[in-house]
């Protein structure tokens, strides 16, 4: 598999952190995280989510990212999961927090772009669920101009009157 991976890697960004003598320190970091040689020589696919416990639109994204990672692995890629920030309008309304809402969209795009560029990922799957995180994730994909897939995390579960 290494030879096959090397041929694929010669055209990918991840070659800078996985192929050749100059990348030995990078590979040592991957081995320290439990990655195998086969995983290191496959394309690296970032799996970015806006998972957090601040709002119901983000709460399921961690679980969804695990499914995405299984899909990437089954397609002979190496998933690298990371999260970014999010500010939810539903909780930021009516106080100073609203000043952070629109700015969070830019921060989401910036942090995803920095993570993907900094770690030389070859592709990106973004999973988001709230109003500012959706465009923030998509903006990062446009900036990066790499193979990308956006997944909408889904709607919030219906309100239960018991909790009011």
PLM regions: where:
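A short, small-residue-rich loop immediately preceding and capping a beta-strand
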Residues: 115-137, 148-152
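Glycine-rich phosphate/diphosphate-binding loop of Rossmann-like nucleotide-binding domains
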Residues: 37-41, 46, 52-81
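A glycine- and small-aliphatic-rich helix-loop capping segment at beta-alpha/alpha-beta transitions
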Residues: 63-67, 99, 139-150, 157
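Conserved small/polar residues in nucleotide/adenosyl-binding loops
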Residues: 162-164
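Short glycine/serine/threonine-rich phosphate/pyrophosphate-binding segments
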Residues: 56-57, 106-110, 130-138, 158-160
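Glycine-rich oxoanion-binding loops at beta->alpha junctions
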Residues: 25-31, 78-126
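Gly-rich Lys/Arg/Thr-decorated short loops/hinges at beta-loop-alpha junctions or inter-strand turns
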Residues: 6-14, 45-52, 85-99
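N-terminal amphipathic/basic leader segments beginning at the initiator methionine
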Residues: 2-39
């Amino acid at each position: 598999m290494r030879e096959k991976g090397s041929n694929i890697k010669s055209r990918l960004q991840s070659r800078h952190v996985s192929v050749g003598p100059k990348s030995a320190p990078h590979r040592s970091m991957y081995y320290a995280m439990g990655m195998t040689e086969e995983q290191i020589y496959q394309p690296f696919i970032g799996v970015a989510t806006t998972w957090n416990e601040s709002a119901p639109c983000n709460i399921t994204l961690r679980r969804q990212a695990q499914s995405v990672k299984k899909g990437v692995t089954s397609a002979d890629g190496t998933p690298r999961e990371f999260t970014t920030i999010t500010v939810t309008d539903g909780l930021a309304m009516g106080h100073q927090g609203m000043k952070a809402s629109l700015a969070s969209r830019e921060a989401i795009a910036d942090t995803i772009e920095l993570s993907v560029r900094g770690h030389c990922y070859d592709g990106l799957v973004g999973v988001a669920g709230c109003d500012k995180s959706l465009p923030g994730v998509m903006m990062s994909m446009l900036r990066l101009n790499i193979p990308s897939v956006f997944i909408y995390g889904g709607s919030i579960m219906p309100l239960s009157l018991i909790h009011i």
